[in-house]
Amino acid sequence: MGEDTQKTQDFTEAHPGNTSLHGEYTVNGASGLGELYVKDNDRITIEFKADEDYFLKDVIYNGKSMLGSMQETYASDGSSQGSVSFNINNTSAVQTLEVQFSPEWAYSTALSGGNIVLSRYVGRNTVVNVPKTWDYYTSASNKVTMPVLLNKSDMGSGIGPFGENREIEIINYPVGGVQCLEHNYGFLYADCVSLRQINNMIYDNAAVSYFGTFARCSSLSEIPSLGGGAALVNIAYMCDGASKITQYPYIGGSQAAPAGVTRIDMAFNNCKSISGTYRINNTQIDIQKAKNSFATHSSGYTNVICSGNTYNSLAFYKSTTSGWENVALNGARSAMLMMDEKENDSIKEKSEPVTVESTEEIIPEDTEQSEDTEETETIEETEVAENTETVEEGTEIEK
């Protein structure tokens, strides 16, 4: 570096040598921190390696957090080894540097519209407390307090901010919630197999996608009310494999949920035990002990498959030009009903058969039906056997 402008930066005893609690690091390639020569406005590069199950949490330079100056603190796969760089412009002869490692938060700190973005949580704690705000220090050491946002998921890899964390049992959001960036809750909790409780919630006031939000959350028994605003555009695979759901929320947080859903695709696929009420667009889907529930909605047709259901388990309300049309699978063990919205006024005249198949061994259970389930008038001429034990494999029930 320029010899005429060299200054000796004496890093204090806050960090003797090149080690820190639960990890080690180098500064500008030097493992011994006795003397470093850096110019004003020069850059410091820290290469770090955390101990097992620990991650980089913060870098404190002259008593200020420098995380806000970092675009990314670690590899996207949640690695605890990597490098970070930031500019310095302090002319003080004595500088202090502290590198912190934590078993909890590992940040991705790109800024977005004056907010701190949390892209990934890779901690090992069973209880996670999501911060409401975070202090960011500018290059001029000015402190700015910014809201924390949750970043959208990487749809290609199927990983959300908390995705694939098998240790998390409880997530505590701050009162008032945390907003999700770009209105995408995709895979937010996917594969959080130990997650059993979510307190408070994220919120949003714009178009929302819930693609795979609770996929394979096998320990979560109740989903809290979800955010939602002007439009719900996609709830595909939302609860795929979430096997113990006992209560669904109102999408949008109220009975008068917003309109505009463009896709419901396999929302309840492979859900082994479901009960309760699910509402979307002010329309109710009653689910009673459903298994492998599959629901699709598009502008062309509605396809409802309830595979392996022993009970009167699913009622799907389909949008038509004349209003909502109730499609019920009354006691069908495995059935498929396909209806074209263009033909919603002449469904009775459709010639395709409804196929009812047995896909697994029948285990006698209490077959008491839900009080909320009603036989539909729109397919009154389609008779689906209510006693699943009498339905033979491959039997077709003609209209």
Residue ranges and their predicted role:
Residues E3-F11, E24, Y37-V38, L67-T73, ...:
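Solvent-exposed loop and capping/linker segments of extracellular ligand-binding repeat ectodomains
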Residues A30, D51-D53, T91, Y121:
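Short glycine/proline-centered coil/turn motifs in the loop regions
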Residues Y37, N41-I44, E52-Y54, M338-K399:
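Mature, Sec-exported extracytoplasmic domains of Gram-positive
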Residues D42-I44, A93-L97:
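Exposed beta-strand face motif in extracellular beta-rich ectodomains
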Residues R43-S80, N165:
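Surface-exposed interfaces of beta-sheet-rich extracellular modules
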